Structures are given as structure tokens and as C-alpha cells.
Amino acid sequence: MAFRATDRVVPVSVNRIEIEAEVPFETLRRAFEAEVPPLDEERFRQLVANGAEWRAFQQAAGGNSIHSFVTFWRNYPSAIMKVGGADIPSASYLIGDYATAARMFRHDAGVMLYAPLRLELHANRSGGTVLTVDQPSSQLTSLQNNKITQTGYELDRMLGDLLEELGLPRPAALRR
């Protein structure tokens, strides 16, 4: 079966933020996972099943901290990568909150390519940890919608708040 379709290529320039922290990988990983808890998926399933109003979703959407992020997904590739010859501790996450994503989604569902945010941690050779994340606003401006771009700047601020809660410096790119 073939479908009629058109395509376009949208060049995107993204700022990747890398923070090298003088803290062991496991210490930062545990702190991150305590600060950005897993999404309570069962609670959201119940809200949908019960026909809850949007206000109930908003109240359940964010975490309990200043940044309001929760973890939607996480992956620990280290064991498999070790078999492949690279013994480097690593963890990847998708983080965000539904309330912020919904404000962008109503303008362009394509925001889901960038929300939730992808964040990665890995050990470096000096015994520290590298935290890597793409700057949200630099991704979201590619959708060419001012409301989405403004929310991207808000996500920059929230990401900076998270980094500070972890005891890391707020990068200049996240100081708007």
C-alpha cells in the first residue's frame, strides 16, 4: 500500500549544553532521579478513565519541585554497551510535564518531537559526570510559532532551576 505524501526538510540549529561536574556518576544519577521522580502513569490512566477535567491533569502533571519535571522514560545502556566494548556508566531520560507540553501542543502537535526533553548522564575519565541536554528554546524555535518559542524560554528557565537544585551551575544559555 502506498500513501500520497509530501515532505520538507527544516534545517534546525540546536544548542547542546554539556556540564562536566566533579561528582561521581552514581551520586549525580541518584540525585537526579530523586529530584525528577517517575511519572505516576496509573494516576493518569485513572484520570482518563474517570473523565477528569483538565484542572485535575494539571494538578497531577508536574513534579513537586520548583521545576515541575517528572521522568517519562529512562534507560541504563551501560550493561549492553559493556558487552560492546565500552565500560562507561550512562543513563538517558525523557523529562517534562504535561501542563507545559499541552500549552505548546495546541499550537503544533509537532512539539512532541522535543517535549519531553531528552537528558543524558555519563561518567567521564576523571571520575566526574557529564550531563548533556539540548537547550529547549533552541529546538522549539524551529516550529516558528511565537507561543511555542516563549514556552521554550520557560523550559530553559525550568531546566536551569533543575540544574541548580542538583547543585550544578546554571549555564549562561539558560539565564533568560
Where would I find each of the regions flagged by the language model?
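Feature detects long, helix-prone N-terminal segments enriched in hydrophobes
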Residues: M1-R176
